[in-house]
Each structure stands twice: as C-alpha cells, then as structure tokens.
Swiss-Prot record:
It is found in: Membrane. Belongs to the ARB2 family. This is Putative protein ARB2BP. GO terms for cellular component: membrane; nucleus. It comes from Homo sapiens. It is a single-pass membrane protein. It comes from the Eukaryota. Keywords: Membrane, Transmembrane, Transmembrane helix. The gene is ARB2BP. GO terms for biological process: regulatory ncRNA-mediated heterochromatin formation. The chain crosses the membrane at residues 229-245. Pfam families: Arb2. InterPro entries: Arb2 (IPR048263), Arb2_dom (IPR053858). The lineage of its organism: Eukaryota, Metazoa, Chordata, Craniata, Vertebrata.
Amino acid sequence: MTQELSFQKFIEQSDLLGELKYDFNEKDEFRHTETQRPFVFNYYENVLEKNSKRYQALGHLLEQYIYELLEKVCKLEKVYIPPEADKEEPRSFFFMSEKALTNHHSALLILLQDHGVFRAGQWSQQAIIHHGLQHGSQIPCIQMALQAHYDVIVLNPNDNFVEPKVEKEWKGLLTQNIESSSLKMVQGGSFFSLQHPPKCIPKRCSNTPEEHTAYIWDYFISKTEGKDIAFIVHGYGGLVFMDLLVRRRWEVMSKVYAVALIDSEHHVGHQLGSDVQLLAWIKHHCREWVTSPKPLDKPAATVFKKEFPMVSAGTEKYILAPSSSLQSIFKYFKKALKARTTINFSRMPIVTRSSTKRKQSA
C-alpha cells in the first residue's frame, strides 16, 4: 500500500526528522526507521506537554498522508463543499470514486467514521500508529469495495472548523524544531493552552458531522438514480446515520439497501421513537458488529439493543472492530444486494403475448 508514497518524505518536509524517525514498513506497520520498534510516545522523558505536542504533530502529518493515499493509491477524487464557495473561505471536503454519481450499474458504498480528531480515510488514528494502516485506515475497505465493483464515497464528518492560531502553529511545527515551536505555543496562549481556547471558524455546510453528512446526501448522493446504496458506520457515525434516516426518511429508505454498524452510538428510543415504519426498516436493513469475546459473526445481542441483528466483530478492542469485521460485512452486503435485486425483479410486470395484444388494441 505504501510503496508508492513514503510517509518519511512527509516528515522530512516538516523538518521533524529528529523527533519522528518513523515510516510504514512492507507490512504497513508504523515502525522506527532505525530500530524497527513500534512508536514510543515518551520521546521527551516525563515531559507530558512536549510529548503531547509531538503526538499531535504526528496526527496532523498522518492526516495529510492518508489524504494522499486516498487520491494516489485509491484513485479517489477530492471534492470541496460547498462547490460555490470561494477558495479563501474555509471549506470541508470528501472523497469519491470517479463515477460514483453517474455509474448506474454498480452499488455505492458510503463510509462514515467515528467522532474524533481523525479525518477522512481513518477508522482510528491510534490503530494506525499502534496496529498499522491495514487496521486503522479505511484504505483496505475502499480497495475491497472497488475490487467488488462498488463505487465509493468517503465522508469527512469531523472536518468542521478552522482554528486560525492552530493553522499558523501547525506551519511552525512543520518548519521548525518542535522544541522551540512548543515554547512559542505556550507563550502565545494557543490551542494547546486550556486557559485560552481559540476562536474557531466553522466550515459552511459542515459545522457538525450531522450537517456534513446531510449536505453531501442532499447535493450529491440523492442525485444518483438507480443506485443501490450501502453504509458502513462506526461509533458516532451510527448516530449520524440514524439522524439522516429521520431527516430524509423516504429517500434513505428507498435508496439504501444495507447498513453495517460497528459499535454504534445511536439511540433508537431517542432518535426514532416509536415510529413503526422506521423501526421496521432498520430491522430489515441494518446489522451491527460489536466488540465481543465471541468469535466473528456469532450472535451478540444485549438487553439494551434488540432493534436489529447484532453479531460479534471478532475482537474485544474497539479500535480494531472495523478491520476485524470487514470480511463479514462485505458478505452481508452481497447477500442483502442479491435479496434486493431478487425482490425488485419479482415486482417487475411480466410481459405476456396476451398482454401485448391488449396493449396494441387499446
């Protein structure tokens, strides 16, 4: 995956080579370039603030690196929203495959991540650093989908605002030694100082994960005709999907054939209430994979969640649940799509010789 694009080049350009001598090896694991050991947080011995800033700088570099992989390895297109916004205006964006909106002969897969500091293309920043790209990034999922002839849209629900001071300080981190820039950040009362939070500039149409998702649904996804749509949602993404279902019920119910939820944070009682139609729809179109000591796919329902089938993700680690359940999820999609196609075909009018004659004589 990483042969085409080295993460070390990003670090070299940032002038943080002394503090971050890391790259992804042939197994896509994040390792020290000299010792081949896993990432060590405590680089500055027992200096929490400096180690935290180093970790945040690493997270920012990983964010940009994953964006590059989405475009250059997965061949996805970066789409800014809203399209009419001036280039100087803070804008959000998402990624999609080349013919995601126009290819009527393939299903469309939409990825909706958990809430956190990470951005499009990541299930978990922590999983990327400690378990590698195969487990923490969305790239294996995207590649699997493309190989199965899905089109793909990768949402970016956590890209909600710009912090002017932080933007300048990131540039400082990316052009200066981290020790000297850390001092400037503390003196300046920056983002990293709890006493002086920065003023945030919200990104239009993407103030929240819910708004980001609804906007892309309204202005992009809903415009597709004849597309069978599936969602993979993780954590808070499950709550965001249920919000979309409530807001755009008829469109979502007619277009979406399957939803794979992973350790979802949705709340059916609060979000769907006692709506009989919505409850019936999720029962037949949703399945959830949850962290569990049970083997993958074994039933794992709880007394709190019984609204649709729940199975084990095959792991007890939250950050590994998406990668652990991926093969099972695609099997579920294949079966659900086949069932949807069969139902649609069975509802088509059967043209007989007698019906043709009646039509001609009418």
